[in-house]
């Protein structure tokens, strides 16, 4: 009902255009979140979804909740906001080491598709990825795919109306590596950011993350192993499919980011991205990037992952992704990788 009321209560919604949206896509654990965290701070330019907003596809509830937030700040000194934030911290604090989450923090906007069974979060609930097949959306039956993409486009339109129609939608979703063709079809002036990280690091890291989630849900080892095999094939697809699609669409602007550069030179990396898209770096964002430079090297991962524990080997990954290994010069050791940070267009 609220969805149908939106264009009636907010006539300007029909005139809101989605212009040159930016999609940050890439294999999970490849720096998509870190990059998105930097970009969304350019709030004069970008619009994105906060986590709590993903529960409300319609514009009307968001308007009401934001209005209540202003009343809370004015009349109750932010009492209800503090309580909501405390509940959010209690719920998500245990998993923030793997992925930062909070109700008032930007989140992967495929969450708006959860009730349509098209969000990557379903892989946490259903280890047999063939049941929901959220990754391979470009291969869905045409009618179902088009219905979902129309819905997603209208969700973005509502969010832009809410945050400012003049802004650019910013999306970060690793699962979108399997729906690049659909994104170009429904957003023909879209721009893509592709972070790349050594798959010898990202693949076992992703599998370890999923093992943690599935263990909490009581999934048995045999079912997990089947899920790992499906995730491995999905991982290979995540590295190869976007480039295959973009090669057919030479007019689409793409910025490719090397993870090693992102973590060692965040300012130069974001400046390169902005140059690729013809953006100017605002003073407020420049200050954010300067702060990011001061934190370089302060966070070192404590995790070590083994390919063998998932029935994989370095040789088979190198064979499947040989062109990318040649292009990026990825080493066998993460320490060796960190010593070389090539830049490219």
Question: Language-model segments: which ranges?
Answer:
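Glycine-rich phosphate-binding P-loop
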Residues: 24-44
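Extreme N-terminal, non-catalytic leader segments
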Residues: 1-20
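Conserved phosphate-donor/acceptor-positioning beta-strand/loop module used by diverse small-molecule
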Residues: 183-208
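PAPS-dependent sulfation machinery
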Residues: 55-169
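PAPS-dependent sulfotransferases, especially Golgi type II membrane carbohydrate sulfotransferases
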Residues: 1, 13, 132-150, 160-163, ...
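Flexible, glycine/threonine-enriched loop-and-boundary segments that flank and lead into catalytic domains
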Residues: 161, 165-189
């Amino acid at each position: 009902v609220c969805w149908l009321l939106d264009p009636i209560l907010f006539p300007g919604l029909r005139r809101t255009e989605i212009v040159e949206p930016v999609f940050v896509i890439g294999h999970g654990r490849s720096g998509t979140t870190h990059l998105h965290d930097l970009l969304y701070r350019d709030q004069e330019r970008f619009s994105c979804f906060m986590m709590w907003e993903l529960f409300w596809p319609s514009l009307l509830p968001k308007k009401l909740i934001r209005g209540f937030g202003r009343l809370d700040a004015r009349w109750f000194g932010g009492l209800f906001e503090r309580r909501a934030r405390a509940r959010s911290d209690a719920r998500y604090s245990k998993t923030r080491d793997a992925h930062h989450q909070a109700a008032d923090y930007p989140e992967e906007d495929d969450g708006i598709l959860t009730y349509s069974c098209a969000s990557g979060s379903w892989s946490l609930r259903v280890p047999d990825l063939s049941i929901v097949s959220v990754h391979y959306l470009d291969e869905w039956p045409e009618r179902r795919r088009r219905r979902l993409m129309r819905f997603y486009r209208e969700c973005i339109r509502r969010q832009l109306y809410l945050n400012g129609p003049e802004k650019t939608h910013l999306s970060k979703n690793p699962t979108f590596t399997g729906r690049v063709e659909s994104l170009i079809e429904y957003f023909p002036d879209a721009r893509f950011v592709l972070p790349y990280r050594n798959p010898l690091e990202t693949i076992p890291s992703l599998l370890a993350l999923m093992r943690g989630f599935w263990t909490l849900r009581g999934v048995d080892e045999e079912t997990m192993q089947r899920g790992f095999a499906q995730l491995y094939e999905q991982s290979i697809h995540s590295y190869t499919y976007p480039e295959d699609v973009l090669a057919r669409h030479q007019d689409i602007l793409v910025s490719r980011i090397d993870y090693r550069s992102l973590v060692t030179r965040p300012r130069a990396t974001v400046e390169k991205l902005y140059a690729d898209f013809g953006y100017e770096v605002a003073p407020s964002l420049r200050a954010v990037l300067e702060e990011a430079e001061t934190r370089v090297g302060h966070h070192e991962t404590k995790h070590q992952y083994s390919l063998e524990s998932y029935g994989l080997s370095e040789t088979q990954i190198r064979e499947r992704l040989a062109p990318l290994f040649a292009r990026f010069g990825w080493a066998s050791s993460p320490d060796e990788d960190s010593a070389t940070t090539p830049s490219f267009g």
